[in-house]
Each structure stands twice: as C-alpha cells, then as structure tokens.
Amino acid sequence: MKEGMIILKLISNVLTKEQAKEIVNWKYEGIYEIYNLSTWDELVKSGCSLCDDIKRNSFRGYLDEDEQLVGFTNLLDEGDEVFFGIGLNPKMCGKGIGKIITKMAIEESKRRFKGKDIKLEVRTWNDRAINCYKSQGFEIIDMINNKTYIGYGEFYIMKYFNS
C-alpha cells in the first residue's frame, strides 16, 4: 500500500500461519513497543494462540486491495460474551484503519455469536486505541490490574452491548 492512500476495501480471511509469522515481525515504536512480540519459536513454546493451528481459527486477517496484511482480530466465544482482540500493522496505526477493522469485527461477531456482548481489555494509557473503541460503541465498564507476559499492567475493560 502506498503512503497516504485511502483504503477503500478490506478483505477478511481466516488468519494463515504465514500471516501470523508476519505479525510476529511487526515492530512498534515509542510507548507502543510494549506490543512487540517475541520470536515465533518462543511464542510456539509458550503456547501462544497465534501460533497454534487450531486456536488460530478464531483469528481473522484483514488485507488491503493490494493483499497486504493491515491488521488482525480475534473473536473468542467465552460463553455469555465474546472476547475481542485486535492488532494493526504499525504502518497503519493512527490512520483510521482500526475503526474500520473494529466495525467489521463487530459485524462478524453479530453474525457468528448472535446477541452476545463483546468485551475487550486495553491498557489505560492507550488513548489512541480507547478512542477507536469508543468511536465504535464500546464503553469502559471497569479497570483491572492484569498479569501479562511482561508483568502487571492497568487495563480498562470495555464492552460493546449487543442489545
């Protein structure tokens, strides 16, 4: 995708192993470095869902018109609600692509998990992501301290109410 172009259409597909390996190599800068992943081999050893052929079926890849991977989502049925995770190619951050992908994921969740609310967790300092989620109808409902692979962090729990 060329710099400054507007994406008119995104294609969604079940995330492939090749796309997952591409995601592992994405490198974020500044405060967002926290989202950089370990190597593929380390993630496989740790049981990361992205690297597991079966668990990866809950992930979707989003491609632009040039078939370049611009982001991914994970929609995981947790009984009463659906857990939502999202990642963007670092080159796409801050360009509105997250809003488009989030909207597409909400629509997919409505189709696949009829009537279930959608929940996500986001670091409390990540205003860019929080604003994206709010723009698509998510609301902050709680704050938690959560253990991650790099230690504890403060997270908002946000919910999209499907009523």
Model-predicted regions and their roles:
Residues 14-17, 24-93, 108, 112, ...:
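Acetyl-CoA-dependent GNAT
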Residues 115-119, 123-130, 136, 142-163:
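C-terminal "cap" of GNAT-fold acetyltransferases
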Residues 1-21, 162-163:
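Conserved N-terminal entry element of GNAT/NAT acetyltransferase domains
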Residues 45, 70-71, 141-148:
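A short, acidic/glycine-rich surface segment
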Residues 21, 130-131:
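Alpha-helical elements of the RecA-like P-loop NTPase motor core of helicases
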Residues 7, 83, 115-117:
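Short, solvent-exposed beta-strand edge segments and adjacent coil->beta transition regions
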Residues 12, 94, 122:
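Conserved SAM-binding loop
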Residues 88, 94-108, 131-135:
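Conserved acetyl-CoA-binding loop-helix of GNAT-fold acetyltransferases
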